[in-house]
A protein has these predicted regions:
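Short, solvent-exposed recognition patches
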Residues: 201-288, 300-305
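Short, gly/Ser/Thr-rich active-site loops of penicillin-recognizing serine hydrolases
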Residues: 186-213, 316
Length: 316
């Protein structure tokens, strides 16, 4: 009963709350800083009782910049990202994976069209704090419905660089967060973004993607979630033969991906149901001798809703 009263109080508060111009201005400052500034730093990802530490280095330039992300815990791996190419170096397997995807990662989490976020989030200024030895200003994005998570961002008061990002559930409790523990903003040597390993003799695996229309194969993939619109529809090469179809929906901040893969030739068993990792919820179904996997940084009910909307109709 107490939880219900808190939820009703939150809904009532959001109904009266309004996005403020000051909050939108801070979002624009954060977005500009993550795109235009060069920096290097160490951040910690936390969800539940698990943590991962990474080092990120970015050089901003007229070509769109270059960025290197290094895992400092567990299995060694490096990711080097340019404007349109992502290379993942796996030294233990001597493999380089090449992709053309452009997924946003911390600290560059915000979309270009910030004003559209106010349709689905109440955006307000939060309290000042201190992160990585720097004074930071916070902005809170609380969802106007239960279909998406809340977000709290804290940025360097001077430069606008995002220092901390937290995802919140519908009770305002943390699901996961990214936090810089050390960061240097300013000129960065280009040597800092070069791969650590000489990978000229390594095996290169390209994840080729081509535009696709799933309806032409009989698949109906749609989303009735307010604000989530289709932003990607492609087919990707998978293993030596075969492929997987992918459709991505996004509200500008959160994204949900639908993957459709034939069961023919698949050796590992399919485990239908719901699973999750931090803020990521995953729903797996079998449909028409295919496995449908829906992965999204959204509440389980939202991901389930999109998964149940995937149907196959035999073409005449």
């Amino acid at each position: 009963m107490k939880w219900l009263l808190l939820t009703l109080a939150l809904v009532a508060a959001l109904a009266q709350a309004q996005t403020t111009p000051e909050a939108l201005a801070l979002l624009r400052k954060i977005h500009l800083a993550t795109q235009k500034l060069s920096y290097t730093g160490t951040f910690v990802y936390q969800q539940g009782g698990q943590t991962e530490t990474s080092r990120i280095t970015r050089i901003a330039d007229a070509a769109g910049g270059i960025e290197k992300l290094e895992a400092l815990d567990g299995t060694p791996r490096e990711v080097v990202r340019t404007r349109d190419t992502v290379r993942c170096y796996l030294p233990d397997r001597q493999v380089v994976k090449v992709d053309r995807r452009d997924a946003r990662t911390f600290p560059a989490l915000l979309p270009d069209e910030l004003a559209e976020l106010a349709q689905h989030y109440v955006i307000t200024r939060g309290k000042r704090a201190r992160v990585a030895g720097l004074d930071c200003e916070s902005v809170v994005l609380m969802p106007r419905d239960e279909l998406r998570y809340g977000h709290k961002l804290c940025a360097d008061a001077g430069s606008g660089m995002l220092l901390k990002a937290r995802i919140l559930d519908n009770r305002g409790e943390m699901i996961e967060q990214f936090t810089f523990t050390q960061i240097a903003i300013g000129s960065v040597s280009r040597d800092r973004v070069k791969p650590r390993h000489d990978a000229r003799s390594w095996r290169v695996v390209e994840t080729a993607a081509t535009p696709a229309n799933m309806a032409e194969s009989g698949w109906i993939v749609s989303s009735d979630l307010p604000g989530f619109r289709k932003v990607v529809e492609v087919r990707r090469k998978l293993r030596e033969s075969g492929s997987v179809g992918q459709v991505v929906y996004s509200d500008g901040l959160a994204a949900v991906s639908v993957f459709i893969e034939s069961l023919a030739g698949r050796s590992d068993p399919v485990r239908p149901g719901l699973s999750n990792l931090g803020a990521i919820n995953i729903v797996t179904r079998e449909v028409a001798n295919h496995v449908v996997t829906v992965v999204g940084e959204a509440p389980a009910a939202s991901v389930q809703r999109i998964a149940e909307g995937v149907v196959f109709k035999q073409l005449q």
